[in-house]
A protein has these predicted regions:
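Helix-to-loop junction immediately C-terminal to a conserved catalytic motif
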Residues: 197
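Conserved catalytic motifs of ABC-family nucleotide-binding domains
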Residues: 304
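The feature captures the beta-strand-to-loop junction immediately N-terminal to the Walker
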Residues: 182-184
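Conserved ABC ATPase signature
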Residues: 283-287, 291
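Catalytic Walker B motif of ABC-type/P-loop ATPase nucleotide-binding domains
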Residues: 308-311
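Conserved ABC transporter NBD signature motif
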Residues: 205-213, 223
Length: 448
């Protein structure tokens, strides 16, 4: 079968036979992955980046380790393992930390300053069904409480016959933290975050936000101004004739004076990098996609929330725009906002979050710091999740005999630093990079 796949993800493009890069309706580059995906400067001009394996290879070469170009992670792992073995690398005992041997299921870990701060959202034994009536939920609950342990999974499981979107979820969000929510499609993430400001009110269990009980209709209405939710593709929330009117909609609904509404509109647009004077009178649908998304963000920020809930805010963005929005969210967090972010990108969660909660079949599967969660690649794989690209390569290198800590969270930069120390500190054997007949030719950017 012939396959043509469109993607923003370079690791996916690396698996193709050929790659065509488009810009403004024209083919900007075309060739094999090895010919295209290592051209860092040209890709950057097209708002794209290199695969993590190429970034790691380039970082190692800059540190004096002459590894060959590899666009696929498995090939880069094999290349580094070859260099390590060639240098006479001896096995080094790396002691695992306590978290290495600890299963993550429903675990709870303390995380930096946020662990000591006050709770802003407290979820206790929350369950939700989109299909069961109150009477049916009580009947189901009675069955589940009388069932033995072996049958409870069948009663509560997220199989096609299960009516439960959330199952007995207990969770605390603390002031000032950046909490990530991960999980496969259908795991309950979006249902959970819609409970955080009362868009969905609790059926069973409780949700308290900023001291207000969201089972109360009055309290749920009051908390909406303080817990802002930005949905996936938030630009689809835009509706007004001008940018200023759209951003002003929420504050006006609060009954604020017009001078305060105007202040909030200008302030929130500035926080997302937009100028009220330049675009305030424009129709939001005349703006670029990235600007539309920023306007939608501004509309939520104009409510001056204490908690910002983001449901896959980078969905559909190219790598450059993705980086811009991650920078924006990080800046808002550093300004004091508590952030809860749903994402399918393990790299984004690893780079941004203080703590990660993993959902599976409507329940909390794991909870911990990024390092604690991503140290358990096999457990995550069992529920259809991966780990960040640098972490994948570090774990694969450890399995290949390169002495790396499996309980440490690696970025590409940190992994390159540690590998350079290992590879350059091995026995005094000259480093060489074989370009053997039949091997993939080095590219112009990477070289051998």
């Amino acid at each position: 079968m012939t396959i043509v796949m469109i993607t923003h993800f370079m690791e996916e493009a690396a698996e193709a036979d050929r790659v065509a890069v488009f810009q403004a309706g024209r083919v900007a580059m075309i060739g094999t992955p090895e010919e295209i995906l290592t051209r860092a400067d040209e890709l950057a001009q097209l708002n794209l980046d290199m695969p993590a394996s190429c970034c790691l290879g380039r970082a190692l070469r800059e540190k004096g380790v002459p590894v060959c170009a590899q666009v696929r992670e498995a090939d880069m792992v094999a290349e580094i393992a070859r260099v390590y073995a060639e240098r006479g690398g001896a096995d080094v005992a790396v002691q695992p930390s306590a978290s290495d041997s600890r299963m993550l299921d429903n675990a709870s870990f303390a995380t930096n300053e946020a662990a000591a701060s006050e709770p802003v959202i407290e979820i206790s034994h929350l369950s939700h069904s989109y299909s069961l009536s109150a009477r049916e939920r009580r009947r189901w609950r009675k069955r589940s409480t009388t069932a033995d342990a072996s049958s409870k999974q069948a009663l509560w499981g997220n199989d096609p016959n299960s009516p439960w979107a959330l199952r007995d979820v207990s969770l605390t969000v603390r002031r000032g933290e950046f909490l990530g929510l991960a999980g496969h499609t259908g795991s309950g993430k979006s249902t959970l975050v819609q409970h955080l400001n009362g868009l969905i009110r609790p059926q069973e269990g409780s949700v308290c936000a900023l001291g207000l009980d969201l089972s109360s209709k009055k309290d749920a209405a009051a908390v909406k101004a303080k817990v802002g939710v930005v949905f996936q593709y938030p630009e689809r929330q835009l509706f007004a004739e001008t940018v200023a009117q759209d951003v002003a909609f929420g504050p006006r609904n609060l009954g604020l004076p017009e001078d305060e509404v105007a202040r909030r509109v200008a302030s929130s647009l500035a926080r997302v990098g937009l100028d009220l004077a330049a675009i305030g009178d424009k129709n939001p649908f005349e703006l670029s996609g990235g600007q539309q998304r920023r306007v939608a963000f501004a509309g939520v920020l104009a409510m001056e929330p204490e908690v910002l809930v983001l449901d896959e805010p980078m969905a559909g963005l190219d790598p450059a725009a993705r980086g811009d929005f991650l920078g924006l969210i990080d800046r808002l967090h550093r300004e004091g906002l508590t952030v809860v972010m749903v994402s399918h990108s393990m790299d984004d969660l690893a780079n941004c979050c203080d703590r990660i909660v993993v959902m599976n079949e409507g329940a909390v599967f794991a909870e911990g710091t990024p390092a604690q969660v991503f140290a358990h690649a096999d457990e995550l794989k069992s529920i259809g999740l991966g780990v960040p690209a640098a972490q994948r390569m570090a774990l694969a290198l450890a399995q290949a005999g390169v002495p790396l800590r499996c309980d440490k969270l690696y970025t590409v930069e940190a992994l390159a630093d540690e590998l350079a120390g290992l590879l350059l500190g091995c026995a005094d054997v000259p480093l060489r990079v074989p370009c053997q007949a039949g091997s993939k030719a080095p590219t112009r950017e990477e070289g051998c």
